[in-house]
């Protein structure tokens, strides 16, 4: 039975939905994301004032955006923070950022460095979740995040200004039916959060993320954010323990806990977004075993060999390799890098920028591969030595193993694939054994 939340989302079976959350929970543990959320919380507290200072400078420089600033402050109070501490925290941050505008040039540089350090840490964490090996150039990363810091407040302020006009236009309707008003306002809050999360999941990782996956992860994160915000606000109001213990500064530890929960939700949504294509297309249950790299490498070479032997093109993109072998992008990249070092394959990169076509599936054409080695001379033993066992030294036992490998795997890849062509080529239809 297929599950389709909205027609343009991925269609998943109930079994795949269960697998998705099981795999996402495993990734959360493997990547130690609760601890990472703690590190991001500390970095956020340090960088929040510099980022707000930059935003305040933009609003001050352009008086036209003063309305946006008011809307942004209202969004911060009503949507981003639980009631009870929002006004207090906003007052402190506004006071700190106003004083920061009077800093010297050296102090301003220090603020900018702090903000950039936070952006780079977020970039590292997101690429770690997507298992990205190749990072963007440092200048490109700084420019991307600088654009987010400068344009983000304006876009949020503009959207909130539009939303306030919408609230005013529908005020009579929502006041007449309180339940409708509550649902309407909550839906708008979730929608704005979903757009923010979705944009984050698409822009930050140095990998093409299909927008359907980002929307699903963004929607789940936005719903979780709204639920946790309401529960946290109820806890702060009903259980005033922090106020009794900390007194006037009680808002600060509560704010730290809230920032931590916000980052935990953000990272969990990122894990779900990254896990969706893996559960849908790849063997998420696979645990590497001794010798499995040899089998996986042969599956990749089989696809490249078939493309080389075809009359069309010998070039194969990584998406086709994934579809034909069920190997993840990170798995296939590691294997292909070894083949690249051995001189068996070549990597071709597109000159154009990354692009995403809305309403269509993306094709990851940035990394394309072609088989260079002559399969008539490359043997199974060569592949085995690269991915499983290489004698290296002159030890007697190693030499015996080397001789056994040569005798048992002397066949050339071309002969092996020709014999296999009577059935399916390795990697064309791999057996799928899910747990």
Curated annotation (Swiss-Prot):
Q: Which residue ranges does UniProt annotate as crossing the membrane? A: 45-65, 103-123, 142-162, 177-197, 208-228, 252-272
Q: Does the keyword Nucleotide-binding apply?
A: no
Major localization listed first in the record, in broad terms: membrane
Q: Where in the cell is it found?
A: Cell inner membrane
Any Pfam family from its record, for instance, is: Virul_fac_BrkB
A GO term from the CC aspect: plasma membrane
The record describes its membrane topology as: Multi-pass membrane protein
Domain of life of the native organism: Bacteria
The cross-references to NCBIfam families, in alphabetical order and at most eight, read: yihY_not_rbn
Q: Which family does it belong to?
A: Belongs to the UPF0761 family.
List the protein's name.
UPF0761 membrane protein mma_2179
This protein's species is Janthinobacterium sp. (strain Marseille) (Minibacterium massiliensis)
Lineage, top ranks: Bacteria, Pseudomonadati, Pseudomonadota, Betaproteobacteria, Burkholderiales
């Amino acid at each position: 039975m297929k599950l389709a939340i909205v027609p343009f989302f991925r269609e998943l079976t109930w079994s795949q939905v269960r697998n998705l959350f099981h795999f996402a929970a495993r990734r959360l543990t493997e990547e130690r994301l609760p601890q990472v959320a703690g590190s991001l919380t500390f970095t956020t507290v340090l960088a929040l004032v510099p980022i707000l200072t930059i935003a305040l400078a933009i609003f001050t420089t352009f008086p036209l955006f003063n309305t946006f600033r008011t809307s942004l402050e209202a969004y911060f109070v009503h949507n981003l923070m639980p009631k009870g501490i929002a006004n207090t925290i906003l007052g402190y941050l506004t006071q700190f950022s106003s004083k920061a505008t009077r800093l010297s040039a050296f102090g301003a540089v220090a603020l900018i460095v702090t903000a950039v350090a936070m952006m780079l840490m977020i970039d590292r964490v997101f690429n770690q979740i997507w298992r990205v090996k190749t990072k963007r150039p440092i200048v490109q990363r700084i420019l991307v995040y600088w654009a987010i810091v400068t344009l983000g407040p304006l876009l949020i302020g503009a959207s909130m200004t539009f939303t306030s006009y919408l609230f005013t236009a529908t005020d009579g309707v929502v006041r007449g039916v309180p339940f409708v008003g509550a649902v309407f306002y909550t839906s708008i809050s979730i929608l704005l959060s979903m757009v923010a999360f979705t944009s984050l999941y698409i822009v930050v990782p140095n990998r093409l993320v299909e927008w359907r996956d980002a929307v699903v992860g963004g929607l789940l994160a936005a719903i979780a954010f709204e639920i946790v915000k309401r529960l946290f606000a109820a806890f702060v109001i009903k259980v005033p323990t922090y106020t009794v213990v900390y007194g006037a500064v009680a808002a600060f530890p509560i704010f730290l806990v809230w920032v931590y929960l916000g980052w935990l939700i953000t990272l969990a949504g990122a894990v779900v977004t990254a896990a969706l294509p893996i559960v849908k297309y790849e063997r998420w249950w696979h645990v590497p075993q001794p010798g499995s790299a040899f089998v996986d490498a042969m599956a990749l070479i089989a696809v490249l060999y078939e493309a080389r032997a075809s009359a069309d093109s010998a070039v194969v993109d990584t998406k086709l390799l994934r579809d034909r072998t069920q190997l993840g992008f990170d798995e296939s990249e590691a294997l292909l890098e070894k083949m690249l070092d051995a001189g068996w394959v070549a990597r071709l990169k597109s000159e154009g920028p990354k692009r995403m076509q809305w309403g269509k599936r993306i094709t990851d054409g940035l990394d394309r591969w072609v088989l260079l080695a002559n399969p008539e001379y490359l043997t199974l033993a060569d592949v085995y030595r690269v991915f499983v066992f290489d004698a290296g030294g002159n030890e007697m036992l190693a030499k015996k193993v080397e001789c056994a490998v040569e005798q048992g795997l002397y066949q050339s890849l071309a002969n092996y694939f020709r014999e296999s062509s009577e059935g399916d080529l390795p990697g064309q239809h791999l057996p799928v054994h899910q747990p």
